[in-house]
């Protein structure tokens, strides 16, 4: 009959390797988190720059497009035509307001 011999050295060796592997994972997890944060910041920055460029492009396009002639005011045909056919539009232009400080 053969008897099995205990493998005490092998158990210690595998436990030691597991500890080294876990240490490596713990140490590299901080680097992985830092890399993910850096990538997120880079993506956010690229999206922000693209949005600013798009906004600038659209603003210049709106400012440079030719303005059409002003629509003529409809003449009142009868007493019941008080602008009910065409809704009134209100255009608001923001103006710099300067408040005096005392």
Swiss-Prot record:
Listed transmembrane segments: 31-51
Annotated compartments: Cell membrane
Topological domain spans for side Cytoplasmic: 52-102
Bias-annotated ranges (Polar residues): 78-92
Record GO biological process: peripheral nervous system myelin formation; positive regulation of myelination
GO cellular component, one term: plasma membrane
PTMs per UniProt: Glycosylated.
Membrane side Extracellular: residue ranges: 1-30
Membrane topology label: Single-pass type I membrane protein
Record region (Disordered): 60-102
InterPro entries from the UniProt entry: NCMAP
Purpose: Plays a role in myelin formation.
Name of the protein in its database record: Noncompact myelin-associated protein
Organism name: Homo sapiens
């Amino acid at each position: 009959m053969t008897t099995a011999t205990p493998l005490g050295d092998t158990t210690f060796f595998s436990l030691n390797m597991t500890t080294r592997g876990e240490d490596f994972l713990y140490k590299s997890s901080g680097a992985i988190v830092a890399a993910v944060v850096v990538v997120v910041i880079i993506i956010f920055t690229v999206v922000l720059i693209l949005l600013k460029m798009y906004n600038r492009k659209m603003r210049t396009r709106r400012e440079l497009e030719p303005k059409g002639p002003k629509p003529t005011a409809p003449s009142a045909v009868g007493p019941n035509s008080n602008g009910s056919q065409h809704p009134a539009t209100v255009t608001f232009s923001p103006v710099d307001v300067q408040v005096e400080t005392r």
